[in-house]
C-alpha cells in the first residue's frame, strides 16, 4: 500500500463527508454504551473533517437486527457520541430516503449527522448496488474508517466506493490498522515474532501458513499446543486436542524448519483435574499430562522461555491468549506474556495485538497502553494476516 489515500492529504472545507464508522458497540440492559472504545477510535477522523470546516454524516451498523428492532437503534449511542466529540449530534431515523436526504441537505459546516442502523435494511449486508447508491447521494466525499467490517463486501463498506471516483479515502483508524499490519507483515524490523494462542489449530491454519514466510519466530500456545504435542507422540491427558489436525500440525513443523522459522511450544503446563477455577492443579511436562488431567495454562519454564524469545524480537504480533483467561487460576501465563511484550515494547520493539480474545486480555489485564497498537478488528485483522485482500480496502484503493 505504497500510496495510501488518507484524510491527512485532503481539505474538507465546505465538504459533506459521508463516513462509514464502526459504532457496533456493546450496550447494557438500559441500552447505554457499555464500552465506548470504537466511538473514541473514530474521533480523530470526525474532528479532522469538522476542523477543516466540513460536516460529517456518520453511518454504521449495530448488532444483527432481523427487523427494525428498537434495541438495535443507533439512537442509543447519541448522548455518548456527543460527550466524546464535544458537539451536538443530529439523528436521522432512517439511513436512506427523504428524511435522510433532507437532513443531509440542511447540514451546515461543523455539524454532525448520525444515520440510523444500516442493517435495518437487508440490502446492506447483501451488498446491494441500489442501496449503496442511495447512501452515496447523502455526501460528496466518502471516508471508510471501519476496519471491523473491512473484510465484508457490504453496501456501505465496499460497494458504495464506486460512486465516488476520486473523492474517497481511508479514515485515521483504518489507515493505522493497515499500517500496523503492514509493519508486521512487510516492513517490520527483524527478528519478527508471531504469538498465536487460542483453542483451535483449524481456525489459525491459514494464518500460520501465510506468516511462516514473514516471521523468524513463532510461539504457539493455548489449546492449540496439545494438537502439536500429541502429533509428536506426547501424552496430553484430557486436554483439548484436534486429532484430525495432527497431520497438519506435523506439516507446519516441517514447513517451519524448511523456512528456518523457530517454533516455540510450551514445555510445561499448569494442569487441572477439572475445567474449573477451583480445580486441583499441578505443573507437569507438556508431553506427560496424566490421564483425566488437562493443561489449562502454560507453566513457569515456558513463561521463562517465551520471555527470552520476546526480548530478542523487534516486531511482535500477538493473537490469542496462552491459557483459559476467563479463570483467574489459569491466566498467569497470558499475564506473564503481556508483561514480556510490554518490556520489549518499552525497549523499542513494535508490538501489535489483535484478533478477538487477545484484545480482551490486553484490556482485562491493563496492557492497553503498554503495547504499540491494539487492533479493533477481530475478523478483519485475522483475514489480513491470512494474506487476503480485504474488499473494503481494495474499494478505496481502486
Predicted regions located by residue number:
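Active-site loop-to-helix "anion-binding N-cap" substructures in soluble metabolic enzymes
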Residues: 1-398
Amino acid at each position: 500500500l505504497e500510496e495510501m489515500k488518507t484524510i491527512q492529504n485532503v481539505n474538507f472545507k465546505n465538504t459533506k463527508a459521508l463516513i462509514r464508522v464502526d459504532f457496533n458497540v456493546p450496550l447494557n440492559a438500559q441500552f447505554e454504551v457499555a464500552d465506548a472504545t470504537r466511538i473514541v477510535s473514530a474521533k480523530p477522523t470526525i474532528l479532522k473533517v469538522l476542523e477543516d470546516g466540513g460536516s460529517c454524516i456518520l453511518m454504521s451498523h449495530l448488532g444483527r437486527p432481523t427487523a427494525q428492532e428498537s434495541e438495535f437503534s443507533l439512537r442509543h449511542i447519541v448522548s455518548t457520541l456527543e460527550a466524546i466529540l464535544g458537539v451536538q449530534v443530529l439523528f436521522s431515523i432512517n439511513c436512506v430516503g427523504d428524511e435522510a436526504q433532507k437532513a443531509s441537505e440542511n447540514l451546515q459546516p461543523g455539524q454532525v449527522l448520525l444515520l440510523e442502523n444500516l442493517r435495518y435494511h437487508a440490502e446492506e449486508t447483501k451488498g446491494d448496488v441500489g442501496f449503496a447508491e442511495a447512501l452515496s447521494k447523502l455526501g460528496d466525499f466518502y471516508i471508510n474508517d471501519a476496519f471491523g467490517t473491512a473484510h465484508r463486501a457490504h453496501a456501505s463498506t465496499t460497494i458504495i466506493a464506486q460512486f465516488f471516483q476520486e473523492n474517497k479515502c481511508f479514515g485515521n483508524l483504518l489507515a493505522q490498522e493497515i499500517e500496523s499490519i503492514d509493519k508486521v507483515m512487510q516492513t517490520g524490523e527483524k527478528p519478527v515474532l508471531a504469538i498465536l494462542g487460542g483453542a483451535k489449530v483449524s481456525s489459525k491454519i491459514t494464518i500460520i501458513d501465510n506468516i511462516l514466510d514473514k516471521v523468524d519466530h513463532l510461539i504457539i500456545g493455548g489449546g492449540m499446543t496439545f494438537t502439536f504435542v500429541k502429533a509428536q507422540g506426547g501424552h496430553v491427558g484430557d486436554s483439548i486436542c484436534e486429532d484430525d489436525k495432527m497431520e497438519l500440525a506435523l506439516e507446519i513443523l516441517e514447513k517451519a524448519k524448511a523456512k528456518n522459522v523457530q517454533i516455540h511450544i510450551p514445555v510445561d503446563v499448569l494442569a487441572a483435574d477439572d475445567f474449573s477455577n477451583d480445580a486441583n492443579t499441578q505443573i507437569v511436562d507438556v508431553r506427560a499430562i496424566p490421564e483425566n488431567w488437562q493443561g489449562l495454562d502454560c507453566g513457569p519454564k515456558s513463561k521463562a522461555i517465551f520471555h527470552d524469545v520476546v526480548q530478542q524480537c523487534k516486531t511482535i504480533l500477538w493473537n490469542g491468549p496462552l491459557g483459559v483467561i476467563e479463570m483467574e487460576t489459569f491466566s498467569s501465563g497470558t499475564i506473564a506474556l503481556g508483561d514480556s511484550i510490554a518490556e520489549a515494547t518499552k525497549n523499542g520493539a513494535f508490538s501489535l495485538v489483535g484478533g478477538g480474545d487477545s484484545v480482551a486480555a490486553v484490556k482485562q489485564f491493563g496492557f492497553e497502553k503498554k503495547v504499540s497498537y491494539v487492533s479493533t478488528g477481530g475478523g478483519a485483522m485475522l483475514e489480513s494476516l491470512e494474506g487476503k485482500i480485504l474488499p473494503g480496502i481494495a474499494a478505496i484503493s481502486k
